[in-house]
Curated annotation (Swiss-Prot):
Reported modifications of this chain: N-glycosylated.
Described function: Acts as a cofactor for complement factor I, a serine protease which protects autologous cells against complement-mediated injury by cleaving C3b and C4b deposited on host tissue. May be involved in the fusion of the spermatozoa with the oocyte during fertilization. May act as a costimulatory factor for T-cells which induces the differentiation of CD4+ into T-regulatory 1 cells. T-regulatory 1 cells suppress immune responses by secreting interleukin-10, and therefore are thought to prevent autoimmunity.
Record's subunit section: Interacts with C3b. Interacts with C4b. Interacts with moesin/MSN.
UniProt subcellular location: Cytoplasmic vesicle, Secretory vesicle, Acrosome inner membrane
Protein name: Membrane cofactor protein
Transmembrane spans: 330-350
Gene for this chain: CD46
Organism field: Sus scrofa (Pig)
Molecular function via GO: endopeptidase activity
Amino acid sequence: MMAFCALRKALPCRPENPFSSRCFVEILWVSLALVFLLPMPSDACDEPPKFESMRPQFLNTTYRPGDRVEYECRPGFQPMVPALPTFSVCQDDNTWSPLQEACRRKACSNLPDPLNGQVSYPNGDMLFGSKAQFTCNTGFYIIGAETVYCQVSGNVMAWSEPSPLCEKILCKPPGEIPNGKYTNSHKDVFEYNEVVTYSCLSSTGPDEFSLVGESSLFCIGKDEWSSDPPECKVVKCPYPVVPNGEIVSGFGSKFYYKAEVVFKCNAGFTLHGRDTIVCGANSTWEPEMPQCIKDSKPTDPPATPGPSHPGPPSPSDASPPKDAESLDGGIIAAIVVGVLAAIAVIAGGVYFFHHKYNKKRSK
């Protein structure tokens, strides 16, 4: 009834004649439109279920109860054993059944360990999508892919790359340096972990060469040494002088590479900086030279006056004792009382004399 009233308001029909032919036609059209727009109960299933291991062989646009969809295993998968249904049927309640995977992953072939190396399987198996990792023994390096994956190659299962090789680690000579040499310099190839040691030649000048850097190098990888070759050069730092200080350790007339000197300050001075310095590779002292700074003189505190011994006090300076102060107060009070009493006596005498005199005159 409410819908009918709404339609009456919406349609340009005369209120007094809602069932005219024109109004009836318009109501019919609106009703048909509502029928088509409102969702209708369906007797068809949705799209067939999707599986990781299977895919539909054929797809239709609609599926009614009883329709059946056949599945096949995807590449890299094969039917399970024992076999499970590889189809699904649209049921009367518009659902699909059965809903289960019916295929399993295929496996790649087992990989042998490379010579002087090993292979491992992080996923715990060699199934489709799994990976294998290769490592080489100490002193060997890998040539090829360290990680390979089990995948589909055409119609067969195969690993993504061929197995790598493990080759022995060898190093080329580390190189000559000016004013220096290294052990076993006659060799063209050095094996893994083999060491060479550098040293400096004797100088023809007044100062000896210093070896700056690592003296021993190790072959740690294919043509890779543990560090760059060192240098042989003259490193000489100037004589260290700290004003108001002195050297307590590291005395010498010349100070070469890594020479160490320790300072202390004279009495009345404080050391600012490090007390120990070292001659660096650039012929400079490291860290910076310390300084001896004069101690600041402490400010004398104000003198505290001590006990004094003055002479006998003058009468004007002497303070009266407390007893004297009390005595003076008592005397003043007595004087005041005495004066008042005398005034009272005199007043009484005057009154008595005046009264007696007036009495005699009256007689």
